[in-house]
Amino acid sequence: LSVSAADKIHKTMDYLLANNKITWEGSLKATYYKWLHPDVLEYDNKEMWDIVPTIYSCFQFDTAISAKALSATKPHSVMDLSAANSLLRLQPDNADETPINRYIRYKNNHEAWVQDTIDFGLNDEERGVLWEYLSDAYGLADSQEKVMRLSMDKRVAGYTLKESNRLRKSIAKKSVKLQEEAKQQFFEYGRKIGTREIFLDYIWNVVFAASMG
């Protein structure tokens, strides 16, 4: 943690102590470990999550844009918080809807993702594959690991670990040439194992597109 972040934790403890929300345990370290250490927080405590969007200068969400996103996403789990943080960093060119805005739309209306995939033309089996990998982030690939795992699935493209890692690197770079080469290989591999063109198209142009540099 930075010095400024440590200072914020210290000040937070001062406020909590002053308002009798926690008790002094003899030292800052002992008090922190008793009340605020990640291992002792109650992650199923709704009240704790309800106040997260109201926190001033929340760690990793301390800009005006990220604070607004935090308020809109209303995280109620570590996974929600992690997804919001990851998706904020994704700003693909020429996107009609930013990843974070799509996440908010899907999170607020779980049926919206289902309907979008139906409208795109995906069948039940294809939607099931996406659900396996993307349900925890409401239909978005919020990490490069998910890009790799999807490409390795034998119902998608059947990549090897090495090939999926190369794909991950290629789509993250701001290189039209590398991205086009990666796209051609992805579609080629998918076609060879019988994956429908429309499914490959959705994964590339909707799921993977959010991670493109």
Each language-model region and where it sits:
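Mg2+-dependent phosphoryl-transfer active-site scaffold
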Residues: 1-213
